[in-house]
Amino acid sequence: MAKYKIGFDMRKLYYLFILIVISCNVSLAQSRKSVSILGDSYSTFEGFMQPKTNSSWYSATPKPETDVTSVKQTWWNKFIEENGYQLCINNSFSGSTICNTGYDKADFSDRSFITRMTGLGFPDIILIFGGTNDSWADSPLGDFKYGGWTKDDLFKFRPAMAYMLDHVIHNYQNVEIYFILNTDLKKEINDSVKNICQHYGIACVELRDIDKKNGHPTVKGMSQINEQLKTFMTQNSETLDSNTIDSCW
């Protein structure tokens, strides 16, 4: 009888230990900041975007256009892993523009940043990396406009950019928001991004000398983006909001 009781007590202790370990792991996960990404091809990797139907440029299948073949080589995965963060949602779509005007003046409202900006979950940090395709596609610039946007306005870069930042500020409160500005874009796009970010008080990370192949970051370029983003955040850490949210969803 005593032997049975000892065995029973040991099982109870074992299960208690397992519960403690699980609780500790859950608490650790909840204390880690979560990151959501709103981007274009630079931030894609097949199988890691939400929704899964989003078009991807990078994948594990080797192709001559790039040397990036692992998600671990992407700028955003490096950034998350090296900072001890967790991925909330990567809502990136290859070829997408911020505004609703895409290549050949096509209607890109099915994939634009302003369409996808509502699907970022509940992160602690939002990284917006866009404007590249607006520049490459010669999307119309439009005027600087900070309210009262019309449907027509959202087919133009400047009002759409303002509309997007206005939305994320008001719908993702207590969240750190960064806009990452690519290299080699048209001056009008660069100046517009910086002016609109300044208007809303959004941190603009202006990249420098990123290594690319076929217009897209190489493995080296991905590392450069990660390092420049980390450096920017470190240098501006005193001004950042340190509040965290327990989980992504």
Predicted regions and their residues:
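Conserved SGNH/GDSL esterase-like catalytic core that processes O-acyl groups on lipids
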Residues: 34, 48-142
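N-terminal secretory targeting modules
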Residues: 1-71, 81-82, 119-121, 173, ...
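Alpha-helical cap/lid subdomain in secreted, periplasmic
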Residues: 107-249
